[in-house]
């Protein structure tokens, strides 16, 4: 097995990617292809499931062949994916009955409101760890059954299959033989009991979704089956599955209770490992399964921030004060602080821990002396402040004081932002050498299942530090800044409340 590699497939919201990793956890090859975003109506977001499959299969082959290798060089495949996105297909033909309804899609928001009005939120949260929201898969499945002609009849006859993106890829890689998912993806459907780790019959009945549609739920690291497609001539074990944020938590080696990672992308996704027991959040966080390896199940708390890197894109495309996103660090660093300016980037409402859909983006503290540099710095600071709000909620829910924050994602390359994040938290922000932690996590899960890596300790030893950012700002200064931020958030919420 000396010359073999692990292939990680990273099926994201805007592109399908594939990466080859060697035994040291280094990236050997990478391929990526974007695909179409479909917006049939305002608030609706869809993907073509066949395009998800064709782009993912295409980059898988490309990542392997561009290094002069073939399928025999692949020891196993690990899959990580955009979560919650919902695909329903015909078991006989393998054809989708409707486009994939993407996690961002809000078409079922009114139906979710009606469930809340029936007083069901506490029950759903107790079973699934999730609030009732159109973000999750359950109401998307129901929408397809209610709105695609003949779908409900076919579903009752056992002729339809539902899957999140991982299930759809495995179904196609095995030529319609395997209909499986893992516990992490199942835990994002709003149909899965995270305590019993089974599909919940009461929730299925409530939403009128036949049990026969659902995939078998497996661990995140086991051999599910082997590839049977023409993508690879040889049969390759499919051996790891995890939703993208769960895979990133594993790739960051946040393997013990209290360890936290923050992925800085378009939004921010913070996840804390809470060990072998789920913690019900009292602070508007989501409780979820982190992963399962063998009989060992780890749980996590998660908080999502809607706008992080997107605020930098707005400064570039909407306001025009920078030409490229990379310019923001130098512009922001040209002033020592924001001079009292606060930017609350609630362009799409506020996510965790506020969950205020009506709040809107606001800038406070502007004076005649305010410059584009102050705005740029306020934008970066806002990413760190929002992350702090979620981390404070995590500490309150878990009773665990955070020792350090492991960071990844595009904006983690911004040293100014990382330093300010450490200053606010009062603990180190730690950046690894390999920031492709989502794909790496999927690779590790697959490799562990087949013995490519012996155990968790061997994998842990591969995590390498790029840079550690230690807090250096005086405590009273931090408290003053945080008080200003909290005031700005209160003002943004008040603005929203006054529009009633």
Swiss-Prot record:
Protein name, as recorded: Glycerol kinase
GO cellular component: cytosol
UniProt: ATP binding residues: 13-15, 266, 309, 313, 410
Pathway linked to the protein: Polyol metabolism; glycerol degradation via glycerol kinase pathway; sn-glycerol 3-phosphate from glycerol: step 1/1
Family stated for the protein in its record: Belongs to the FGGY kinase family.
Job description of the protein: Key enzyme in the regulation of glycerol uptake and metabolism. Catalyzes the phosphorylation of glycerol to yield sn-glycerol 3-phosphate.
Keywords: ATP-binding, Glycerol metabolism, Kinase, Nucleotide-binding, Transferase
GO annotation, biological process: glycerol catabolic process; glycerol metabolic process; glycerol-3-phosphate metabolic process
Keyword Kinase: yes
CDD domains per the UniProt record, alphabetical: FGGY_EcGK_like (cd07786)
Superkingdom assignment: Bacteria
Catalysed transformations (reactions): glycerol + ATP = sn-glycerol 3-phosphate + ADP + H(+)
Activity control: Inhibited by fructose 1,6-bisphosphate (FBP).
Keyword set includes Nucleotide-binding: yes
EC number(s) recorded for this UniProt protein: 2.7.1.30
GO molecular function: ATP binding; glycerol kinase activity
Gene source species: Burkholderia ambifaria (strain ATCC BAA-244 / DSM 16087 / CCUG 44356 / LMG 19182 / AMMD) (Burkholderia cepacia (strain AMMD))
Binding-site list for glycerol: 83-84, 135, 244-245
The gene coding this protein: glpK
């Amino acid at each position: 097995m000396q010359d073999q590699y692990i292939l990680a497939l990273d099926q994201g919201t805007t592109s399908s990617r594939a990466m080859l990793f060697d035994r040291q956890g280094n990236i050997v090859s990478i391929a990526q292809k974007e695909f179409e975003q479909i917006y049939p109506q305002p608030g609706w977001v869809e993907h073509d499931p066949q395009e998800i499959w064709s782009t993912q299969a295409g980059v898988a082959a490309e990542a392997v062949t561009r290094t002069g290798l073939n399928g025999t060089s692949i020891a196993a495949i690990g899959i990580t994916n955009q979560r919650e996105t919902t695909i329903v297909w015909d078991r006989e033909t393998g054809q989708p009955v409707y486009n994939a309804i993407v996690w961002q899609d809000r078409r079922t928001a009114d139906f979710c409101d009606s469930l809340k009005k029936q007083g069901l939120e506490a029950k759903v949260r107790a079973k699934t760890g999730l609030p009732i929201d159109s973000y999750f898969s359950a109401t998307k499945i129901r929408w397809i059954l209610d709105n695609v002609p003949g779908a409900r009849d076919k579903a009752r006859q056992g002729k339809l299959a539902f899957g999140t993106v991982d299930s759809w890829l495995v179904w196609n890689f095995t030529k319609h033989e395997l209909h499986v998912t893992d516990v992490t993806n199942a835990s994002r459907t709003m149909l899965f009991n995270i305590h019993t780790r089974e599909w919940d019959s009461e929730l299925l009945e409530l939403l009128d979704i036949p049990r026969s549609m659902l995939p078998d739920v497996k661990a995140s690291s086991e051999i599910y089956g082997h590839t049977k497609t023409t993508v690879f001539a040889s049969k390759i074990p499919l051996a790891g599955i995890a939703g993208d944020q769960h895979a990133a938590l594993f790739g960051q080696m946040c393997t013990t209770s209290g360890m936290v990672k923050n992925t800085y992308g378009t939004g921010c996704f913070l996840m804390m490992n809470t060990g072998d027991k789920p913690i019900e959040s009292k602070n508007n966080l989501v409780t979820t399964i982190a992963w399962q390896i063998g009989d060992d199940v780890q749980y996590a708390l998660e908080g999502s921030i809607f706008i992080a890197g997107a605020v930098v894109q707005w400064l570039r495309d909407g306001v025009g004060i920078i030409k490229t996103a990379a310019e923001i660090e130098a512009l922001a660093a040209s002033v020592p602080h924001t001079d009292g300016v606060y930017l609350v980037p609630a362009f799409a409402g506020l996510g965790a821990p506020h969950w205020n859909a009506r709040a809107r983006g606001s800038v406070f503290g502007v004076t005649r002396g305010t410059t584009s540099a102050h705005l740029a710095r306020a934008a970066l600071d806002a990413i760190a402040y929002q992350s702090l709000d979620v981390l404070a909620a995590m500490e309150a829910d878990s009773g665990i004081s955070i020792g350090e924050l492991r960071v990844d994602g595009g904006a983690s390359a911004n040293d100014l932002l990382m330093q300010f994040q450490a200053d606010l938290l009062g603990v180190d922000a730690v950046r690894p050498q390999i920031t492709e932690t989502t794909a790496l996590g999927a690779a590790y899960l697959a490799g562990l299942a087949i013995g490519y890596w012996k155990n968790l300790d061997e994998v842990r030893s591969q995590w390498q530090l790029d840079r550690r950012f230690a807090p250096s700002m005086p405590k009273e200064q931090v408290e003053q800044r945080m008080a200003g931020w909290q005031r700005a958030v209160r003002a943004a919420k008040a603005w929203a409340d006054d529009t009633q």
